[in-house]
C-alpha cells in the first residue's frame, strides 16, 4: 500500500546518507515528501549532488518534494546551482 506523504528530517552530519534513504522510500509514496532541512546551515558539493539525484528520482516517480526550514544561505546555494526551482518550500 502506498503512503500519501512522508516527512523526513535531514541531519547536517549525514545529509548524503539521509537523502539516499529518503530516495529509497520514494517507491512507496504517492503525493509528496517533506524534507526538514532546519538543521542544515551549509551544504557541501556531495550533498548538492545527492540533492540533485534525489530530485531526479522524485521527478521520475511523480512525487512532489517540499523542503521545510531551509536556511537562507542553503537556499542561495540551491538557487545558484539551479536546484531551487525543483522543490517547494515551507517555513
Regions found by a protein language model. Name each.
Residues 10-87:
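Amphipathic alpha-helical interaction surfaces in cytosolic regulatory modules
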Residues 1-9:
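Short amphipathic
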Residues 89-91:
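Short, charged, intrinsically disordered terminal tails
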Amino acid at each position: 500500500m502506498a503512503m500519501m506523504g512522508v516527512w523526513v528530517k535531514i541531519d547536517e552530519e549525514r545529509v548524503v546518507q539521509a537523502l539516499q534513504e529518503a530516495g529509497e522510500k520514494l517507491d512507496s509514496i504517492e503525493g509528496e515528501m517533506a524534507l526538514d532541512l532546519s538543521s542544515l546551515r551549509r551544504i557541501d558539493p556531495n550533498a548538492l549532488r545527492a540533492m540533485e539525484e534525489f530530485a531526479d528520482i522524485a521527478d521520475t516517480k511523480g512525487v512532489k518534494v517540499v523542503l521545510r526550514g531551509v536556511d537562507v544561505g542553503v537556499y542561495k546555494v540551491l538557487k545558484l546551482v539551479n536546484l531551487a526551482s525543483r522543490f517547494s518550500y515551507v517555513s
